[in-house]
Structure formats: structure tokens, C-alpha cells
Amino acid sequence: MPRVRERTSPDLIRADCVSLSPAEGRHEPLEMQSVFDQAWAAYNGRHDAMTLGGETMMVHRAGAGYPLVCIHGWAMGGRSFAPQLALIDKGFEIIAPDLPGFGDSAASKEVPTIEAMARLIRELVSALDLSEVTLVGWSMGASIAWHMAATSPASLKALVSIDMSPRVAPEDGWAFPLSSGMTRETIELAIQAMRTDWKGYCDLFLDRILADPNNQIRTALAALAGQADPETASQAWLSLMQFDARADLPQIQVPALAIHGGRSVLYPQTVGHEIARLMPNCRAIVLDHVGHAPHIEAPDAFNAHLLTLAKRGPPAPTLCQHITAQ
């Protein structure tokens, strides 16, 4: 079992906090930091540049204990897992890399496919000599987590996917693609828009993440999106459209949760039931009042489910459960 280090922790940090004290050494004035940056500073987060497979990635870390390796969504960064820092006080270490071309990591030398990014996460786990890892993937990060768990399960203890479909692109007979009405033509138009007007495209995308308006969280998400390299983002998006995890899911044996937002406008909430049907040791949970970012919009409920999974495996009886998140 990983050794847990004693620590003195600040107050529980939620995604909607506004008055957090930065740790020593932060150079930005408090009012200029996003709510995510404030949380990482308050929990004395470390930000380490690591070279893995010829790529240099920024890896955000805080705490000590059972490792939670958190893989961010498309156009985002590792700091988006700030609401999970509260789990440090439950004996966990949060490890949240910025994938190449996102957050504080430079663009990749190779095409950023889902498979290539999964290899980088595997190399990160190996380089840090981690064991009993709970892998957490948000959106695109879930695709990466599924592929890694199916192809490189060593060192993994559990897996959590956040509001994602195993097949994003539309396909005859497939009921769970990204946003009903999407076509091959709209996919091409989206990629073109990313390359020509990244900020404009991000503004439209960010409007679809949260179920309810929250300026502080949206500003924090926008700051992360603004750091992304548009060409990397467009290539990753194309890979996401081509990727199909349906063959991966039956190969994943670790205990797993598929957590979805009941008000997500990106994916139908019923996709969680399909994921749990395909994955032998998975349970789907729908947090009724949240959108595409359950870990940010309902951190207490999300963290409680993650804690139960990481310590005891998935709760047994029902395949899919709807929960009203407070």
C-alpha cells in the first residue's frame, strides 16, 4: 500500500470558492489567478516538467498516498481537476498532467492520437513508479484511460470515466455519438474553425460544458483552453472522431465507474448504461443536475463516488443509478 504522509491541510476547497490563500512562491496576484490556480496553490501543488517518450509534459501534483492519475478533457489541462484536491485529506495523491499541446505542455512532435497519449500516460505511471493507480479520465481523457486500461492494465486499481461516449463520431445504428445531428460535414467544419478562429470556437464550446452559468469556473476553463495549441487540438479532435473504444471496454477488468451529467448537452446520459453493459466490472452513475463536467459542477458527490471506488471497488447492485447532486 502506498505510504500516506501526514500533512496540515487548508479548508476543503470547492470549485466555487473565491477566497483561497495562495501558497508561498506564487507570482500572480490572487485576483489574477483562476479558481483552479488558487486551489492548487492552497494545497501546495507541485508543477514538474517531465520528459517522457521524447515529450516534455507539465505534471501537476499534490498530496501523498494512493495515486489518482487524472487525464484532462479536450482543450483543457490538468489543473481542471482542482476540485479533486479535497481527496488529499483522505489519503490520496493527485497527479494531473498537461497532455502535449495543452495547458503548460509544449506541442507534440508526433500526431496527438488517443493511442499516443495513452502511451504517454503509461510512461508517466512507470516513470513515477506508481502502483494501485486509480485512473480518472474526463471526456477525451476517458478515451485515453479506456485505451490504457485495455492495453496496459498493470499498476491499475480502478478507473473512472467522466461524461464520455466510447464512440464519438456518428454511425448507423449507434445511439450515443457526440451531440445529436452531428455529421461528417460538421466534423470537418469544426476542425477548420479550430484552425482559423481558436478563441471563437472555444467560446462556443465552453458555453456547452456547464449545466448552469458560473463565471468563475467558465473563466478558469477558458484560461486553460486559451493555452492550447490550435493545431494540436484539431489533430486530437480528429483522432477522437476516429477512435472507437467499444472493443476496448470488454477487455477492462478493473473496477470502474462511468459518471455522467444528467443535463449534459454533449452526450445522452444513457450512454453510461451502455458503457456499464460493455465493461465487465463497471457501474454507471448519473448526477442529475450537472452537465459535461460532473467533477467540477458537483465535486462533493463526484469525490464521494471516487473515494468509494478507489478504496472498496464499485458498489454492487444496480447497473445504473441516478443521483440528485447537491
Report each predicted region and the residues it spans.
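Alpha/beta-hydrolase fold catalytic core
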Residues: 1-68, 89-93, 130-131, 283-285, ...
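Conserved acidic catalytic loop of the alpha/beta-hydrolase fold
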Residues: 116-133
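Conserved HGGG/HGGXW glycine-rich cap/lid loop of the alpha/beta-hydrolase fold
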Residues: 55-107
